[in-house]
Amino acid sequence: MASKGTEGGHGGVERKEQQQQRGYQLPRDSRGSLEVFNPSSASSFRTAAAAPKSASPFLAIPDREEDNVVAQQRAAEWGLVLQTDHHTGLPQGVSARPSSGSARTSSEDNPQQQQSAAAIPRVSEELRAALSAFQQTFVVSDATHPNHPIMYASAGFFNMTGYTSKEVVGRNCRFLQGSGTDPHEIDKIRQSLANGSNYCGRILNYKKDGTPFWNLLTIAPIKDEDGRLLKFIGMQVEVSKYTEGKKDTVVRPNGLSESLIKYDARQKDHARSSVSELLLALKNPRSLSESSNNTLKRKSQESLSMSMTEVPSKRSSESGSRRNSRSGTRSSLQKINEVPDQGNRTRKSGLRAFMGFLGMGHGSVEKNMLKPRDEDPLIDSDDERPESFEDEFRRKEMRRGIDLATTLERIEKNFVITDPRLPDNPIIFASDSFLQLTEYNREEILGRNCRFLQGPETDRATVRKIRDAIDNQAEVTVQLINYTKSGKKFWNLFHLQPMRDQKGDVQYFIGVQLDGTEHVQDDAAKEGVVLVKKTADNIDEAAKELPDANLRPEDLWANHSKVVLPNPHMKDTASWRAIQKVLESGESIGLKHFRPVKPLGSGDTGSVHLVELLNTGEYFAMKAMDKSIMLNRNKVHRATAERQILDLLDHPFLPTLYASFQTKTHICLITDYCPGGELFVLLDNQPLKVLHEDAVRFYAAEVVVALEYLHCQGIIYRDLKPENILLHRDGHISLTDFDLSCLTSCRPQVFLPEDADEKKGRKNGSYPIFFAEPMRASNSFVGTEEYIAPEIITGAGHTSAVDWWALGILLYEMLYGYTPFRGKTRQRTFANILHKDIRFPASISVSLAARQLMYRLLHRDPANRLGSYEGANEIKGHPFFRGINWPLIRATAPPKLEIPLFSKDDMEKKGLVTNNRTDMF
C-alpha cells in the first residue's frame, strides 16, 4: 500500500522515521510484530506478585495499573479504546474510538457505541490465531493514521520481501517501490486509500536485496458498523512466474494482444476471493473458527479432514444400495482425459442388480425406494442453515457467474503454442506445467522462439528435423537434450503438430514436451509418443474454442452484425413483425431504433436495459457488452458462442433473438423482455423465502424441458440459477444468459424398450425413448459458485450432467430458501461441494420424493447422477413429477403463490415506467 509522497529505493529503515510514526516503543511478539492483536488477553495483564488473600475474591487476579496503561496504548494503535470492568479493573475488551478522536473509558461508552463496535475483533487471542492460520502474504495497516503505518505483517510477507519485522512494522509499504514501479498504478492505490475503497492491481515491487518481482496487490478496507474506516488489509501475491508482466502491452500487427490469454483478470479473480477470507477473520475470528468446525465436521463429530484436492470416489454415505441409477459410462461422452480415469464405473449398483434378480424392473425399484421408513436417513435432526452474510460484496460475489479458466488453461501438461504467421514463430501460450519444467517465467518466454531451450549438447540434426517439419507444416516427434533456465540438462520427448483452421490453413503449432532423465530406445518411447500425440489433439480441440489471434479486431465481432432471421415458431408474433418492418425498409437494426426505458441489471462485462422499438410499443431486453472488457477478460469466445446459441433457439421456455448489432464500444443483443422478472426476486418476496412444493414442481418441470431442448441442440447450459430464470407475463419461465454455455455437436439416439413384445410393452407404457446429449466434454472452470458441479472444480472434464447437478441445487434453494453447500468463502463453498454430505433440515416439511430426487441429482459421480443414462427422460419419470402432463406443460396454469407474481395493478404497467435517460453506455 502507498500513501501520499514517495520514497525511492528499497533498502533499510531510518530509526528516526520509526520513532516519529510510533512515538514510543511497544512490546513485540516472538517475530518482532507489535502486540496489537492482544489488547484483552488476560495473560498480558496478570502480575506475578501475590495479592493479599483476604482482599481478593475467589480466582480474582489483580492487575498492575501500568499493565492497563500499556494495554490502552496497544489498543490506541488500532484506533480502539480499552474497556475495563468497573469493580475488578480487568480488561473486558475494546470499543471503537469516537469520531471526535477523544479516548474514553468504558464507563463513558454508551450501549450504542458498544454495538457499533461489534464488528471489530474483541477476543484478540482468537484473532491472532485465526490470522496465523492463513498461508496468504498480507499486512494490516492503520487507516486512522495519515501515513497508513503497518501494524501487522504475516510471516509470508517477511519471506517474500526479505525484510525483518523491525524494518516493516510501523512503516508505510512504499519502501517496496523502486525505479520500475508504475507511478500511474501508485496513483490508483492512493486514490483507493483516500476513498476507503477496494483496489486490485499488479505492480512491480522490489525485495530487500533489490530483486524486482510482480506483486498482485489487493487492498480492502475494514470498517465498523457505522461505516468508519479503521484499517486496511493488503494481500500480496508474487505472480512473477505466471503473469505476462510488461508483455501484456505487446500487440500484434493487427492490434490484438500477442499473448493468447490475458492473465491479469484471472489472477485478480483469485485474489479477490482469497482476501475475503482475511476480512472475515479480522471482523469476526470466532465465527470463522466455528463455521470452519461446522463445515469440516459431520454432526457425529467425524472429521472430514480431506483437502479440497483429495476428491473421494464416493461419499461415505453413498453405498451402492443407496443409489438407483445406471452407472455405465457412455461411449458418446468423449472426455478430455487430462486426469487419470477414476476406475471402472460400468458396474451396476448392488440394489439394482438385486432387484433385477428378483424380477423387479426400474419402476418397481422406484416405488420400493419411496416407501417411508421408520427413520429417514435423509432428514437432519438439526436445522443447519449456512451462516448469514453481512458483507454485501460477498453476497453479490457468490451469486455472480465466474469464468476462472478455459479448457486450454486447465490441461496439465508441458506444452507451448506458437504462431508461424508472426516473425520467428514466437510462443503465444505456455502452460503452467511448461513453466515449472523449464524454470522460466511466462514474461521471459512469451514472444520468443523455442530455441532458448537448446544448449551445447543439443543435437543439431534433430533440431533440423523440427525446422523441416515447420517449413513443411507437418508433424514430427523427436528426442533431444534441452536445458532449464538454471542450466539443468534433461531429455525431452518433443512432439510438434500443426493446428489448422476450418479452411485447412495452418493457424498455430503445438509443441508438447515429455521430460525424462535419459534417452530411451524407440520401442520404449512408443508409449510416450502416444501420450504426447493425444495431448496435442486435446490442445488442438481446446484452442479452437478461442478466437483466432490473427483476426482483425473488427472481425472478432463480425458475427454480431449479421441479420437475424426468424425461427418457425416465433415468426408471426407482434415483436417479430415490428422488427421485420424495419428490415423491409432497407435499414439495418441498430441502437438508433431503440428508446431506452430503464436498466434491468448489470454484470462484469456489460448491462441489460429495457428498450422500446421506436413508434411500435414493442418492448425488448437489450444486453450490451463492452468490447474492451471482453478482450481483457478473455470473453470474446464466450460472446461469440452466446450469439450462435441464441440464433439456434426456438422454444417457449428459452429466449428469442430478434437482432444483434455493434457500436464502436459495445456489442448488443435484442431478446424478449420478461416483465415477471427473476425467479430469484420472486423467491425473495415470499414470506419464508421458499415456495410450496406444487410451485417448485411447476418451475422445475419447465426447467427440465428447457434443458432437454438445449442438450438436444448440443448446448451445455452451465449457469442454471434463480437469477437466470425469467418469468413471462403468463407466469411461465424463460432461461437466459448463455455467455457461460458450451456449444458442441449432438448425438441423437433412440432406446427401444427392453420387453421384446411390442404390444405388451406399449400396454405397460414402455415406448421407445428419444435421447440426445452434447457429444464433446469441456473442462472450462465456469459457473456460479454455489451451483458448480464437483467435476468442474476438480478439472476432470464435464458433460451435460453438470446441468442436472445444478437442477438439484435449484430444487434445494426453492424448497429450503438457501443452497446446501454455501460457505463463508469461495474456497469453503468448493470444499463443501466436494466433501460435505447433503442433508435436509427437519424444520421444513418436504416430501420424500422431493428429497430423493435432490439426493440423486446431487451425486458427485456424474456417471451415477440421475440423468446420465437417459437424460431428461430419467428425471421426468421420477415420482416427484408424477401428475405433470409433459406434452401440454405449456398450457398448464402457473401455481398460486403467497405473494403473487404481479399485483392487482395493471400488468402492462409493470416495469414500463418511462425514463428520459438516453445514454445507456
UniProtKB/Swiss-Prot annotation:
It catalyses: L-seryl-[protein] + ATP = O-phospho-L-seryl-[protein] + ADP + H(+); L-threonyl-[protein] + ATP = O-phospho-L-threonyl-[protein] + ADP + H(+). The modification S-4a-FMN cysteine is found at C173, C450. Residues 594-881 form the Protein kinase domain. ATP binds at L600, G601, S602, G603, D604, T605, G606, S607, V608, K623. Residues 1-11 have a biased composition (Gly residues). The keyword Flavoprotein applies. Coiled coil: none annotated. SUPFAM superfamilies: Protein kinase-like (PK-like), PYP-like sensor domain (PAS domain). Induction: Down-regulated by white light in dark-grown seedlings. Its cofactor is FMN. Residues 123-197, 400-473 form the PAS domain. Autophosphorylated in response to blue light irradiation. 2 molecules of FMN bind covalently to cysteines after exposure to blue light and are reversed in the dark. FMN binds at residues 172-177, 190, 205, 215, 236, 449-454, 467, 482, 492, 513. Highly expressed in coleoptiles of dark-grown seedlings. Residues 312-321, 364-376 have a biased composition (Basic and acidic residues). CDD domains: PAS (cd00130), STKc_phototropin_like (cd05574). Residues 197-251, 474-528 form the PAC domain. Keywords: ATP-binding, Chromophore, Flavoprotein, FMN, Kinase, Nucleotide-binding, Photoreceptor protein, Receptor, Repeat, Sensory transduction, Serine/threonine-protein kinase, Transferase. Residues 97-117, 286-295 have a biased composition (Polar residues). One of its GO terms (cellular component) is plasma membrane. Belongs to the protein kinase superfamily. Ser/Thr protein kinase family. Undergoes a photocycle characterized by fluorescence and absorption changes induced by blue light. Homodimer. Protein kinase that acts as a blue light photoreceptor in a signal-transduction pathway for phototropic responses. Regulates a wide range of physiological activities in plants that maximize the efficiency of photosynthesis, such as chloroplast relocations, stomata opening, and leaf expansion. The PAS (PER-ARNT-SIM) domains are required for the binding of FMN chromophores. This is Phototropin-1A. The gene is PHOT1A.
